[in-house]
């Protein structure tokens, strides 16, 4: 009988087996089973040093879904952490519901490095983001409530702190040079899905996929993309007598 099982139990069990067999990879004593712990776990493995622009750890919201079963609880806790000023959420990609997460301190430090102490951006961080850490802002609110003029807003967009929203007069919070991250992320996603797609039945054991190598341009690493494809429902995760199996969903067979 096939039954569901938590991702982290599977991954950690595989890592413990490697340790017993002499692999250099360390075992994990505490398994993240809540939103905050899962966020910290994923962020801690983000390869900042591999990026020219030294991105801060970027975690996709749906990656946390691979660890925590109840997505409503994840969304609720992330929103609470955002309102408490611990992290920021921003849209990434073309879909409105695809969100990324960065710790607030990491975000502000990265902005300081990237934007060369711009007075407009410093004003935005202190007067807007620190007080009202929203995912998007209206032109009216920025001008009326916070005193930004059109030239200021244009600079925020030019520097990559804001991006134009689909609705007229609205702007999404963003991060400078996010396009570089997205290019790398999508490249790695395609690469790891190719490993699954090339198998005979479009399925692969989790511990086998963890051992696969990605191209050098896939900077984010195998684990990062495993959390992605499970959390985004690109694959179904099922348990078999041989271990956890990842099975590609029909709509992802040809990408």
Spans of features found by a protein language model:
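Non-catalytic recognition/regulatory regions in large multidomain proteins
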Residues: 1-255
């Amino acid at each position: 009988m096939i039954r569901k099982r938590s991702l982290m139990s599977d991954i950690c069990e595989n890592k413990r087996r490697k340790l017993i067999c002499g692999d250099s990879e360390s075992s994990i004593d505490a398994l993240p089973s809540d939103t905050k712990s899962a966020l910290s776990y994923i962020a801690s493995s983000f390869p900042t040093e591999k990026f020219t622009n030294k991105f801060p750890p970027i975690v996709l919201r749906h990656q946390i879904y691979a660890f925590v079963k109840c997505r409503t609880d994840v969304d609720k806790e992330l929103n609470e952490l955002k309102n408490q000023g611990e992290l920021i959420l921003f849209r990434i990609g073309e879909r409105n519901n695809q969100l990324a997460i960065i710790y607030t301190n990491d975000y502000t430090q990265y902005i300081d490095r990237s934007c060369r102490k711009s007075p407009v951006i410093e004003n935005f961080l202190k007067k807007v983001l620190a007080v009202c850490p929203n995912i998007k802002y209206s032109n009216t609110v920025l001008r009326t409530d916070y005193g930004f003029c059109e030239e200021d807003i244009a600079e925020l967009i030019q520097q990559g702190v804001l991006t134009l929203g689909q609705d007229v007069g609205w702007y999404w919070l963003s991060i400078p040079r996010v396009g570089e991250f997205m290019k790398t992320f999508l490249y790695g996603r395609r690469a790891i899905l190719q490993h699954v797609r090339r198998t005979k039945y479009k399925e692969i054991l989790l511990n086998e996929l963890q051992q696969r190598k990605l191209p050098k341009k896939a900077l984010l690493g195998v684990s990062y993309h495993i959390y992605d494809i499970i959390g985004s429902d690109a694959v179904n995760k099922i348990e078999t007598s041989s271990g956890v199996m990842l099975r590609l969903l029909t709509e992802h067979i040809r990408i």
